[in-house]
């Protein structure tokens, strides 16, 4: 009888996790069609850092690319910052891409934080990675770059801009970069971070070792706490119309921060 209960409990947990994964897939499908993120014939580069968000994006887009409509191709790239002491399991990341028959590229680059003291090292690192993705995308004939930003990232960036820039702006689902003749898309823009945390545990995504010397200086963790505080006041705060005004238009400019 105890064994039956244990088996029944495991089945309930598996069913719950599978329902959550399908829910996330539905959110991505809605984002794709509502914001015109992916069209027939697109060749999309996905940046795979090794964190739960990018692992989930490779998993989800890899599965989605096998569906008939829209028809698109996915290429996966892992950017290695040689001046930051962190370690990623490249073979594991390669296996995650190859699980969906996706090409996997490793690209090494670096940045010098002393070249522009007006910008934070986190900004310079992010921009260097982004520039590398543009170069890889061009080299592999990709017309779009998919990033693993989720709903929490978008709302936290909104709060950062309001707090530090006094401006109402954040990362849009689709961003046209005319300078590079490229589009950046965020297919997980409607997915909550807590949903991805559950999926990562269910899927068993491996955590990558990281020891970034600049991480503690980031204000994003403060914005996470601020978002939690807002939700404590109003559990529906993240779904308010004000939070979603940035999703109504497809920006062609760079967002702030």
How would you name each of these model-derived features?
Residues 21, 126, 216-219, 234, ...:
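Generic structural signal for well-ordered, non-membrane alpha-helical segments
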Residues 157, 170, 245, 251-252:
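Ser/Thr-centric signal marking residues that sit
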